[in-house]
């Protein structure tokens, strides 16, 4: 009897073992001869490596890359995820093999953005997507970096930022006069929203504050939900459970798109193709010209989606960069003084800084680069996916594989930066301190690269420079003695700092 029970137990154990082995083998893709799967850590059944990611996936995956290399694979739930680190490896994938890695995964959170019709977030990577991207890029350039013949400014962007920076200066000084301190984030957000609003719609959001500004100020729900590694995207059951953040995210998307639809409809009613004043008008004009063509017409809802993408390209990244910059300036007053000395020497105090001053302000440029690198406030690009079976660095990567691009790791790679956790803007200067080290500056990664590179990159860099130059020329920023600025990032699609309500600003000179 005992022998029979032992035999039965051994048979059962053997059966279970064989079943587990079969499941593991079935889980693994069949590899072409001579290739291997990317290495990676062992994961728990059903959970995969989700517990390893924790609250800071960029840090966890950077540590894993030190062990497994620049091409590694994890599982979140039952979904395999390729994680790419290292600048050369990422450039190989996104640039040299750009067509293979230009897709977007079909993730739940991304599908909620304009019903999977967003140029930036949707899985589409075909000819229609490419045409929409070109159209959006051209429209953005026309009303940002192109010159306005009727203005003394070098381009539309400079004109808008110069006006908004003056308004921001006034608001900050009013806050100082009233309460003696302020939280700069919402004030910066309003100014940046007004710049992109002027380019997209021809007006400032102050005219529609009841509709749009509270919505924009709640955009933190957006960047939290679409962050890389969100369990919501990999465990479908979570989509049906009570989730206040998810509901706020859905409400944000729905309300924001409805607001854009209203603005586009108003443009359509008043549209005159002989007098195009903004990006929305340019897209409507494109439709008027191509309405008789079979392949050029864009439905009105598609125009709303393009405007949504363009607005996003020029809003959140700029707001976050300027806000982080102010936090670092009050935490590093000596660096602030050095930048202001450079501004006084090159520009003086009789006129506003202009975009043409950039080459003569290397320390300002170095500071912005170091903000991009040190904060790495866009820790991952929006997730990519493979469009076909491919290989990378000798590893087999199947079609439709979800791919995380770890920009934080690139910006904190000790082999590249030596002391990656030190904040040193001067690292980007040449030996004589007069110019930017171009080779090193090109190793900073914040806007992605390749076919999915952010269409607003140039716009964002120019806008960040001009806002900061104007603010620092006129104001000295500080916090009261004893107030400690918390520079610990809060994880999301774009990482924010803890809000500080104790920032102060003192005029550096009087305006006559």
UniProtKB/Swiss-Prot annotation:
It comes from the Eukaryota. Substrate binds at residue 222. It catalyses: an organic molecule + reduced [NADPH--hemoprotein reductase] + O2 = an alcohol + oxidized [NADPH--hemoprotein reductase] + H2O + H(+); 17beta-estradiol + reduced [NADPH--hemoprotein reductase] + O2 = 2-hydroxy-17beta-estradiol + oxidized [NADPH--hemoprotein reductase] + H2O + H(+); 17beta-estradiol + reduced [NADPH--hemoprotein reductase] + O2 = 4-hydroxy-17beta-estradiol + oxidized [NADPH--hemoprotein reductase] + H2O + H(+); estrone + reduced [NADPH--hemoprotein reductase] + O2 = 2-hydroxyestrone + oxidized [NADPH--hemoprotein reductase] + H2O + H(+). Induction: By polychlorinated biphenyl (PCB) in liver and kidney. It is a peripheral membrane protein. Constitutively expressed in liver. Its main location: endoplasmic reticulum. One of its GO terms (molecular function) is estrogen 16-alpha-hydroxylase activity. One of its GO terms (biological process) is estrogen metabolic process. It is found in: Endoplasmic reticulum membrane; Microsome membrane. Its EC number is 1.14.14.1, 4.2.1.152. Keywords: Endoplasmic reticulum, Fatty acid metabolism, Glycoprotein, Heme, Iron, Lipid metabolism, Lyase, Membrane, Metal-binding, Microsome, Monooxygenase, Oxidoreductase, Steroid metabolism, Sterol metabolism. Glycans are attached at residue 65. Its cofactor is heme. PROSITE patterns: CYTOCHROME_P450 (PS00086). One of its GO terms (cellular component) is endoplasmic reticulum membrane. InterPro entries: Cyt_P450, Cyt_P450_CS, Cyt_P450_E_grp-I, Cyt_P450_E_grp-I_CYP1, Cyt_P450_sf. Interacts with PGRMC1; the interaction requires PGRMC1 homodimerization. A cytochrome P450 monooxygenase involved in the metabolism of various endogenous substrates, including fatty acids, steroid hormones and vitamins. Mechanistically, uses molecular oxygen inserting one oxygen atom into a substrate, and reducing the second into a water molecule, with two electrons provided by NADPH via cytochrome P450 reductase (NADPH--hemoprotein reductase). Catalyzes the hydroxylation of carbon-hydrogen bonds. Exhibits high catalytic activity for the formation of hydroxyestrogens from estrone (E1) and 17beta-estradiol (E2), namely 2-hydroxy E1 and E2. Belongs to the cytochrome P450 family. This is Cytochrome P450 1A2. It comes from Canis lupus familiaris. The gene is CYP1A2.
